[in-house]
């Protein structure tokens, strides 16, 4: 999982990317290509 300041550019890299908020953190998850996981921090 990558940790990035801004997730907007990571989200646009694949059309299945989803922006999710969990426990106060913002994540990008992808059920199809799992290598696109990222967390904002």
From Swiss-Prot:
Record bears the keyword Ribonucleoprotein: yes
Family per record: Belongs to the bacterial ribosomal protein bL36 family.
Annotated organism of origin: Rhodopseudomonas palustris (strain BisA53)
GO MF annotation list: structural constituent of ribosome
Disulfide bonds: none
UniProt-listed SUPFAM superfamilies: Ribosomal protein L36
Keyword Ribosomal protein: yes
NCBIfam families listed in its UniProt record: PRK00831.1, rpmJ_bact
Name under which the protein is recorded: Large ribosomal subunit protein bL36
UniProtKB keywords: Ribonucleoprotein, Ribosomal protein
One of the protein's GO biological processes: translation
One Gene Ontology CC term in the entry: ribosome
Family annotation (Pfam families): Ribosomal_L36 (PF00444)
């Amino acid at each position: 999982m990558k940790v990035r300041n801004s997730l907007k550019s990571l989200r646009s890299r694949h059309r299945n990317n989803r922006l999710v908020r969990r426990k106060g953190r913002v994540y990008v998850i992808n059920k199809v290509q799992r290598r696109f996981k990222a967390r904002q921090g």
